[in-house]
């Protein structure tokens, strides 16, 4: 196959992965606002950063990248701390997801160029164009967190409700008929 066709195929894959990442972010926003209160939403996305980061350990195991375990494990630990702190501090979630997008970019750079950005064999292999999908999700969801930061701060104030948005979602109590 000619290099131009290969490059064109890669561009199509990249565009599709970015679109899927954007749709995933939109779906995450829609569902979290539908079913979760502001406080629950912040907790969910804080905890969700942990398995998102953990994907790279799964990739290291799958691709047999034994040399990548120390760096990937350290990255998972850092993202886990950011996620746990983000349960109460919105800025930590914004930074955590944005940094995870950068982490995705580093892996994608290594995958596409064959050259190590951080040193030989220190990062794990990833599926083709996975970094584009994940980085688009991370950046868009971090932007959403920025718009929700004031609501999340307010949700932790004394007397704040923990139930999902009134009239929507699971677990909404029905008003008594009088």
Residue ranges and their predicted role:
Residues 67, 99, 133, 168-175:
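A subset of signal/propeptide-processing and intrinsically disordered low-complexity segments
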Residues 97, 101, 105:
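Catalytic glutamate of the conserved HExxH
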Residues 2-20, 33, 40-50, 74-91, ...:
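Functional transmembrane or membrane-interface alpha-helices that line membrane-embedded catalytic
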Residues 55-86:
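Helix-adjacent hinge/juxtasegments
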Residues 152-178:
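Short, highly charged, low-complexity non-transmembrane loops/tails of multi-pass membrane proteins
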Residues 25, 29-66, 161:
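Aromatic-rich, lipid-facing transmembrane alpha helices and their immediate juxtamembrane interface loops
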Residues 24, 30, 170-174:
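Polar low-complexity intrinsically disordered regions enriched in Ser/Thr and small residues
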Residues 92-96:
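Active-site alpha-helix of zinc metalloproteases
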């Amino acid at each position: 196959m000619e290099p131009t066709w290969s490059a064109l195929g890669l561009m199509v894959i990249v565009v599709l992965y970015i679109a899927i990442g954007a749709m995933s972010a939109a779906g995450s926003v829609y569902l979290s606002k539908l079913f979760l209160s502001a406080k629950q939403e912040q907790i969910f996305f804080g905890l969700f950063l942990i398995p998102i980061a953990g994907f790279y350990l799964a990739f290291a195991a799958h691709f047999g990248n034994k040399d990548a375990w120390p760096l990937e494990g350290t990255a998972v630990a850092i993202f886990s701390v950011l996620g746990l702190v983000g349960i109460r501090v919105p800025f930590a979630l914004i930074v955590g997801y944005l940094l995870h997008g950068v982490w995705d970019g580093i892996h994608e750079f290594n995958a596409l160029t064959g050259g190590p950005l951080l040193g030989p064999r220190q990062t794990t292999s990833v599926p083709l164009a996975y970094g584009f999908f994940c980085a688009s999700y991370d950046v868009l969801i971090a932007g959403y967190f920025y718009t929700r930061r004031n609501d999340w701060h307010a949700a932790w104030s004394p007397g704040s409700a923990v139930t999902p948005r009134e009239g929507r979602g699971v677990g909404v109590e029905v008003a008594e008929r009088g």
